[in-house]
Amino acid sequence: MENLDALVSQALEAVRHTEDVNALEQIRVHYLGKKGELTQVMKTLGDLPAEERPKVGALINVAKEKVQDALNARKTELEGAALAARLAAERIDVTLPGRGQLSGGLHPVTRTLERIEQCFSRIGYEVAEGPEVEDDYHNFEALNIPGHHPARAMHDTFYFNANMLLRTHTSPVQVRTMESQQPPIRIVCPGRVYRCDSDLTHSPMFHQVEGLLVDEGVSFADLKGTIEEFLRAFFEKQLEVRFRPSFFPFTEPSAEVDIQCVICSGNGCRVCKQTGWLEVMGCGMVHPNVLRMSNIDPEKFQGFAFGMGAERLAMLRYGVNDLRLFFDNDLRFLGQFR
């Protein structure tokens, strides 16, 4: 047992003088590992008389615990010292000025949508929303566009199957509102729509705002006055507005709406292709068939509808010449609108 006491003293001395955690691990292996000094002493128990083995075994276990406790204590001490040294070296000077954070802002398309909603909210319109995954009936059939109608070729549609699709306009929201609500109805329907098209002025996903008013005694004059007032409020200018005859299956009569070019004030430029006019939206009186399919009597009620692309209006308002810039996530571009 004198050898055991000597081994313990030797191990404790080595632990006390160690200044490195890695060296501490080597000491542990040397004394307590599978081939360590104290482990080898334990293996000599078989050479002792049976009556002495329990007593000697207990002494060896006490010795091993003493060495292990010393190793643990020294390791904790060394790790604490290392942490303190690192904290001292990495101390933060709280008197240094902080780094500024870039502030974000609303996306120009979001700004445009909010502005459109505000313009119509002031004159009594409510905001209505609907599903982006739509069925064929609400996207086409209920809007006077049956399966054989050539107007379907105007919509490059993303289909999931024969009946379900990504909506190509927000007009289905108008249909769903007319199905669930009796006149008078005054709504605007902002939202994402999808068409298989992509170039400088088209995107496969874009934002559209459509409006609907249904009541008694509604005329094209009401539609004309509403649109003229909206466009002047949106652009904050006294713009010239003109209506050109057009065709939409769900309105009759129908019209395209042009405004005096906001870039050249009607003098002619590259943006308006030297015409002095810019097309901004479509409109018309709600077709009687559309009213009937929503169980509204066209003999008693009339309505008008209009639709516009939010990106198109944003391009004109902010002077952007490429629609795709709105979706490139380029902070250099978006930072101009904070």
From Swiss-Prot:
Keywords: Aminoacyl-tRNA synthetase, ATP-binding, Cytoplasm, Ligase, Magnesium, Metal-binding, Nucleotide-binding, Protein biosynthesis
EC number assigned by the record: 6.1.1.20
Predominant localisation class: cytoplasm
Pfam families (UniProt xref): Phe_tRNA-synt_N (PF02912), tRNA-synt_2d (PF01409)
Sites where the protein binds Mg(2+): 252
Catalysed reactions, semicolon-separated: tRNA(Phe) + L-phenylalanine + ATP = L-phenylalanyl-tRNA(Phe) + AMP + diphosphate + H(+)
Listed NCBIfam families: pheS
Record-given protein name: Phenylalanine--tRNA ligase alpha subunit
Organism in which the protein naturally occurs: Pseudomonas aeruginosa (strain UCBPP-PA14)
GN (gene name): pheS
